[in-house]
Amino acid sequence: MNHSLKPWNTFGIDHNAQHIVCAEDEQQLLNAWQHATAEGQPVLILGEGSNVLFLEDYRGTVIINRIKGIEIHDEPDAWYLHVGAGENWHRLVKYTLQEGMPGLENLALIPGCVGSSPIQNIGAYGVELQRVCAYVDCVELATGKQVRLTAKECRFGYRDSIFKHEYQDRFAIVAVGLRLPKEWQPVLTYGDLTRLDPTTVTPQQVFDAVCHMRTTKLPDPKVNGNAGSFFKNPVVSAETAKALLSQFPTAPNYPQADGSVKLAAGWLIDQCQLKGMQMGGVAVHRQQALVLINEDNAKSEDVVQLAHHVRQKVGEKFNVWLEPEVRFIGASGEVSAVETIS
């Protein structure tokens, strides 16, 4: 139990695992999984560990997915990319722009690997992965059988996909297929992007604006450990939103296609005067209340305690109950984050 997980999670929480294996191809990943399973150990597959909170020591094998490679197919209507799951997401965004293939610029600086992007259906500034995802290639761990899921089969939702449900433990993502249409359409619906002129804006300007917003608001995990947005933006019924807006007319709200309304969790937390609040070694970030940061050798108990406090305060004031976006990992695998902080 002496393999530290601290370098493998951006929160910088210091727990150990029994074994840590880096897999650079599909066969190495399968071998590591099958070896650990034969020994009766639980197995966790990680990308860059940018969306996990280890609650305790992990009693099994952690496999770090480092399957690399980018292939491009140039078709008349779009560029098709086949990207290894272990590629860094932001480096991919930069690469596509440099190569004149826009479409990912709103998703700049999202931490983590390409293989993690469909699990969460990552999104930012009005764009989600499902907008550009063509397929996801997986391998069935027990058999080594390769499976390709179309974007529709991935059942993408808000920070959700089939990879959090039926496909969670039996399959590993080895590559993601992206489709970037040649008729580029800027998405300028959020934040500072609304100030850009849709008739003249370039993909590089959108990329630069997104990077500026993220770097000014969000802490660098290399300086202060964090897992990005700790809570999901809550999606509530139209009735709940109407009641809340009658009391708090300035609350940011984003009506969804299905009639529900997305609220800004950061705003709700901020209204409870929780920015900068600290418990043990963890604190609510002073610029972006949605982020919890490791100020000083935080322990996982500190994070759970502070997350519970934030959830209670927001729930009491707004009757809206926040759910973590971060995945909570116990001794033998993922546990319910909501139950842990309730």
Curated annotation (Swiss-Prot):
NCBIfam families: murB (TIGR00179), PRK00046.1 (NF000755), PRK13903.1 (NF010478). Monomer. Cell wall formation. This is UDP-N-acetylenolpyruvoylglucosamine reductase. Its main location: cytoplasm. It comes from Escherichia coli O157:H7. The gene is murB. Transmembrane segments: none annotated. Keywords: Cell cycle, Cell division, Cell shape, Cell wall biogenesis/degradation, Cytoplasm, FAD, Flavoprotein, NADP, Oxidoreductase, Peptidoglycan synthesis. It catalyses: UDP-N-acetyl-alpha-D-muramate + NADP(+) = UDP-N-acetyl-3-O-(1-carboxyvinyl)-alpha-D-glucosamine + NADPH + H(+). Pathway: Cell wall biogenesis; peptidoglycan biosynthesis. Substrate binds at residue 190. GO terms for molecular function: FAD binding; UDP-N-acetylmuramate dehydrogenase activity. It comes from the Bacteria. PANTHER family: UDP-N-ACETYLENOLPYRUVOYLGLUCOSAMINE REDUCTASE (PTHR21071:SF4). Its cofactor is FAD. HAMAP family: MurB. Residues 13-183 form the FAD-binding PCMH-type domain. Belongs to the MurB family. It is found in: Cytoplasm. One of its GO terms (biological process) is cell division. One of its GO terms (cellular component) is cytosol. Its EC number is 1.3.1.98. The active site is at 159, 229 (proton donor), 325.
